[in-house]
Amino acid sequence: MAILEEIDDVDNMDFDPAEFDPRAVLTDATAHQESDGRGPINLISKAEHERREQAKKQQEQQQEQQQQANPMAQLQQMMDQMNQGGGMPPNMGQQGKPGTQVFDSEEFKNQEIQESDFKDWQIVYPVYFDKNKTVGEGRRVPLELAVENPLGQTIAEACKMLTLPSIYEAHKTHPKDWANPGRVRVQLKDDPALGLPPHSVKNKRHLFRLIAQYMKEHPTKEVTPYQGPVFQKIIQTNPEFPWNSKNLPPKPQYPRGWKMPEILPILSPALSHGEANNDMMEQMANQFMPKIPEAPPQQKVKKMKVRVGR
């Protein structure tokens, strides 16, 4: 036989009147509204709110100290700012065209970030996309994807468009393309656990094809080097720099038979900046096309003839 039990409808089982303090009732003067954006607004005391804010500040300070002690964490923080559109940290290069970031190796050293921290990143040179180069001379893309006068700053813009962490080293040159400085280091890994943003680049070959397509859509013009971040940085440090988009330098003079771009970056050693530099060209020619050394003169040896009588 079923037994009916009368149940009290009042839910006061957890309430102890002895613990009630009328002075602790939350009022407009003592309450703070708290919400995490996912649920209803909670009322907490202002003292509790101040305690939580203080703990949050201490946690942020500890994270900042850890990032300063860890160069890779500092580098990753810069990459996060780049990918979120927050710009570059101060004293870490200049920003020119939208999507272009410039990092100089010396500035990384000043920030206690060594080149060894990103030595395993893929390196991309402009010569890989030069239409006037053969495969043996450094070209790495098919001829139909190659372009005229490729520049490192355009490669950096392409990597930024692809949301790839990249570093533009404006002074670095390829041994077979000494007149066209500028290379880009690219991180192709896609690991959210490491804070690396997702991307659609499959491998290095796919990356070269995407960069080549970007270069096809953004051909190099004579004013292109003077619209990039390197030129902006030079103007800031040297306002009397003679060349700009309206006053272009004379075209570089190469030794006969050399295949070199006609449009070069500002930092190219082939640009004389208005003055002929024959000594530099001679040194370059001797460095990359050394002359065959002549054999030392040999001393004449006197030959003695002896007659033998019969």
UniProtKB/Swiss-Prot annotation:
Q: Where in the cell is it found?
A: Cytoplasm
Q: Which Pfam families match?
A: SRP19
Q: Name one GO cellular component term.
A: signal recognition particle, endoplasmic reticulum targeting
Q: Name one GO molecular function term.
A: 7S RNA binding
The GO annotation for biological process reads: SRP-dependent cotranslational protein targeting to membrane, signal sequence recognition
> What is the top-level taxon of the source organism?
Eukaryota
Q: Where is the composition biased (Low complexity)?
A: 60-73
For bias type Basic and acidic residues, the affected ranges are 46-59
Q: Which InterPro entries match?
A: Signal_recog_particle_SRP19, SRP19-like_sf, SRP19_arc-type
Keyword Ubl conjugation: yes or no?
A: no
- Report the main location listed first in the record: cytoplasm
Record region (Disordered): 24-73
- List keywords of the entry alphabetically: Cytoplasm, Ribonucleoprotein, RNA-binding, Signal recognition particle
Q: What does this protein do?
A: Signal-recognition-particle assembly has a crucial role in targeting secretory proteins to the rough endoplasmic reticulum membrane. It must be involved intimately in the translocation of a wide variety of protein substrates.
Looking up PANTHER family in the UniProt record yields:
SIGNAL RECOGNITION PARTICLE 19 KD PROTEIN, SIGNAL RECOGNITION PARTICLE 19 KDA PROTEIN
- Complexes and interactors: Fungal signal recognition particle consists of a 7S RNA molecule (scR1) and at least six protein subunits: SRP72, SRP68, SRP54, SEC65, SRP21 and SRP14.
Q: State the family named in the UniProt similarity comment for this chain.
A: Belongs to the SRP19 family.
Official protein name in the record: Signal recognition particle SEC65 subunit
